[in-house]
């Protein structure tokens, strides 16, 4: 292959990847559905990203999955699930800002809420659901507490953390761990679909 042809092919490949990344960055391509579903998440280290994808899988893959950092336009979606990772009792500032800015457009479309947290590696209970979802995420979304909701245990992966957070946790001798369970996320996705069908 001539050098000029090789360079042309290389530039075309890079261009194609750039276009596809801009048009659907971090969008998960699922199965088709007569209704448009989306899962929106905010994450620091990837735990909520994995939870969001697994929740969509539990819904038989009918939901697109969006990272709030992409500032997605969800106006074309009929049903939305919202969740995020917790630090100091709250989801990320970016997710909070997005929900406040889009509250009126999203409120009537939200079908489920979830958070991912460390909870000192202890199983979450009603106290965490009340504190992190009912009294925080549900308020940000301006929705009732009757929606499907779930608190998942998360993980610590130092290689995915910003330097300040990593140093702080390492200062407490916090080990890396992974308590996020795919099966729990799949089950929650199935619950969302079931509850939505029953409520029709």
PLM regions and their residue ranges:
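Short acidic low-complexity segments
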Residues: 65-75
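N-terminal beta1-alpha1 ligand-phosphate binding loop
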Residues: 21, 36-54
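FMN-binding flavodoxin-like domain, especially the glycine-rich phosphate-binding loop
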Residues: 25-35, 50, 57-62, 66, ...
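A broad, low-specificity signal for short, low-complexity segments enriched in glycine/proline
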Residues: 39-46, 73-75, 108-114
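N-terminal export signals
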Residues: 5-26
């Amino acid at each position: 292959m001539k050098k000029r042809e090789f360079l042309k092919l290389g530039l075309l490949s890079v261009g194609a990847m750039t276009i596809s990344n801009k048009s659907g960055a971090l969008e998960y391509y699922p199965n088709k559905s007569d209704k448009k579903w989306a899962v929106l998440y905010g994450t620091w280290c990837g735990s909520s990203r994995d939870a969001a994808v697994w929740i969509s899988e539990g819904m038989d893959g009918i939901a697109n999955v969006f990272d709030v950092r992409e500032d997605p336009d969800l106006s074309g979606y009929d049903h939305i699930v919202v969740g995020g990772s917790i630090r100091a009792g709250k989801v990320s500032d970016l997710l909070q800002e997005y929900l406040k800015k889009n509250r009126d457009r999203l409120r009537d479309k939200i079908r489920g809420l979830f958070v991912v947290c460390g909870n000192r590696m202890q199983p979450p209970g009603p106290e965490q659901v009340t504190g992190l979802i009912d009294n925080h995420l549900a308020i940000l979304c301006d929705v009732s507490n009757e929606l499907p909701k779930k608190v998942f245990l998360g993980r610590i992966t130092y290689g995915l953390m910003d330097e300040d957070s990593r140093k702080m946790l390492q200062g407490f001798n916090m080990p890396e761990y992974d308590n996020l369970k795919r099966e729990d996320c799949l089950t929650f996705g199935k619950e969302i679909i079931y509850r939505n069908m029953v409520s029709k």
